[in-house]
Amino acid sequence: MRASRFFISTLKEAPSDAEIVSHKLMMRAGMIKKIGSGIYTYMPMGLRVIRKVEAIIREEMNNAHAIELLMPLVQPAELWQETGRWDKMGAELMRVKDRHGREFAIQPTSEEVVTDVVRTEIKSYRQLPINFYHIQTKFRDERRPRFGLMRGREFTMKDAYSFDRDIDGLKKSYQIMFDAYVKIFNRFGLQFRAVAADNGAIGGSGSHEFHVIADTGEDALVYCPNSDYAANMEAAEALPLSSARAAPTQALTKTATPGKAKCEDVAALLNLPLAQTVKSIVLTVEKEDKGVTSKQVWLLLLRGDHELNEVKAAKIPGIAGYRFASEAEIIEWFDTPPGYLGPINTKKPVNLVVDRTVANMHDFVCGANEVDFHFTGVNWGRDLPEAQVFDIRNVVEGDPSPDGKGTLAIQRGIEVGHVFQLGTAYSESMKATYLDENGKPQLIQMGCYGIGVTRILGAAIEQNFDDKGIIWPTALAPFEVVLCPMGYDRSEGVKAETDKLYEALQAAGVDVILDDRGERPGAMFADWELIGVPHRIVIGDRGLKEGKLEYQGRRDAAATPVALEEMLGFVQAKLAN
């Protein structure tokens, strides 16, 4: 490719609405162009990166014996109504009507359509297992699109769906896809971590997320440096911080804490460690039976320095669909405003749940259900009946690892892939069955596996950039090598040697671009450093007189002189690494 025949459009400054590094650099490098909230045109430079991401994914999916198809962007409402997701998805699901008044969804995911394909095409156990995948545009009507390709409304994903006879088959298919994902992300040249995760709204049980490691990542990844244990914050198990509860040493005492409504302030006033305080979180669950709505109030207790894990809380039996109680509801049940709540002497009965760590505490401090007062010296069994105990908190750095092999560490990551064991969550609601060896219908076991194709671009940049611009891993770069001739239009020697090297690199299969635009050296170098091409070769009269060219990797502090006749092999060796 010659730069004069390609479209290159760079900016010195990022648009004012670009918030994070990847968004700013992609806009400045001319890779994307915003045309609406969360909607972008992929410009030629950016599209080249997308195509390289897709090519790696497609090759590894094919190697894993997944079969490519292409499902529609616009999908009939009836399919989504079968699974109930037409209503469950809420406003994020874009709904449209055609001229006949028929309703359709602009798909954010394709479980319904692929299940419909399988239930009509797969009849016998002999046709299983099978795995279909596609790479398709999606649309999710995000409430607040931001961060460029990291959280847009229109985006591209690879979705694969496996179908098996039984759970054992599903687990095998799941492992095959998990291994394929590891190969894909290794080929991308990115630092990543696979972590155990919660299935969330998509349903089923058993899943892993794949995260690109980045300090700017939205997600907290929990792992043990001494083992293979890794989970996202939602799924990471928080073990009790003591093996047994100590005996009481203090009497229950109602203590004045004027104006101290936060655990931190109470601990400071009483000259106690924050870890000796307990915070109260009030949740409300409304249930309807025969047209009558009843309300249940739940009181969850956490250590003062811990945070509620809302995903874990939702798994407490009977609490599904909870919301945080309003101040009016809190006063109705506790006769006191937030800040002084506790489990002793509530105005109305509540369902009490305590975190594992709280269950092992003694002589702790909690609200007294009276403004400006807390109880000290609170102990289970004596002052309070034993309560339901669940793991309901976020882990913190230094917690014991659930596998017993050390303590936990936390790093930030950007989710770019997710694999799920769906089981029969969709085949049951859509009646997707096969006939077994005895001619009896059996529900198909299903798995689904997604990679955010366009999100990979943003995540890769968040991990790989400097003050000059993007630093693409070679496998993802729009071009592997850029040739920067000094005076290409003025020096016959420079032009001849540049053209010769360009043709040799092309013949060797190197993805090379020759910058023949006639730009000044400073501007030319700045463009390619911003765009992030990983390998640069400079050809100039001065070097040619000595029979040398200059090579500089995008991460290199200085250029390396290389003999003219050795440059092709030198570059090939760099690319091989």
UniProtKB/Swiss-Prot annotation:
Subcellular location: Cytoplasm
One cellular component term from this protein's GO annotations in UniProt: cytosol
Keywords noted in UniProt: Aminoacyl-tRNA synthetase, ATP-binding, Cytoplasm, Ligase, Nucleotide-binding, Protein biosynthesis
Molecular function terms from GO: aminoacyl-tRNA deacylase activity; ATP binding; proline-tRNA ligase activity
PROSITE patterns, sorted: AA_TRNA_LIGASE_II (PS50862)
Cysteines paired by S-S bonds: none
One Gene Ontology biological process: prolyl-tRNA aminoacylation
EC supergroup of this enzyme: ligase
Entries under Gene3D superfamilies matching the protein: Anticodon-binding domain, Bira Bifunctional Protein, Domain 2, YbaK/aminoacyl-tRNA synthetase-associated domain
UniProt record similarity statement: Belongs to the class-II aminoacyl-tRNA synthetase family. ProS type 1 subfamily.
Domain remark from Swiss-Prot or TrEMBL: Consists of three domains: the N-terminal catalytic domain, the editing domain and the C-terminal anticodon-binding domain.
Function: Catalyzes the attachment of proline to tRNA(Pro) in a two-step reaction: proline is first activated by ATP to form Pro-AMP and then transferred to the acceptor end of tRNA(Pro). As ProRS can inadvertently accommodate and process non-cognate amino acids such as alanine and cysteine, to avoid such errors it has two additional distinct editing activities against alanine. One activity is designated as 'pretransfer' editing and involves the tRNA(Pro)-independent hydrolysis of activated Ala-AMP.
Subunit (UniProt): Homodimer.
Protein name: Proline--tRNA ligase
Species annotation: Janthinobacterium sp. (strain Marseille) (Minibacterium massiliensis)
